[in-house]
């Protein structure tokens, strides 16, 4: 059985404030996260079309962003809504969602 690579699948991903085609969701090669690992994520399970403890996951994601000194650019309510929209747009009833945030390419230096 051949596996479909993760970068060649059908669906949509929320990226930089909009839904984008799965195949087009690519960070720039000079993004800080690729060079220095400055990324946070939260793995979340969905059951019956609803993310289990979504708000708690969002709050933990926000806290993780804080530890790396960057902001989650949306409110908790907006983040929960975005995750629900991604589930619906991809017809996910029972599945896994990974919300993640990273620093962009606006800064490549190491700072203290």
PLM feature segments, named:
Residues 1-112:
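Conserved alpha/beta cores of soluble small-molecule-handling proteins
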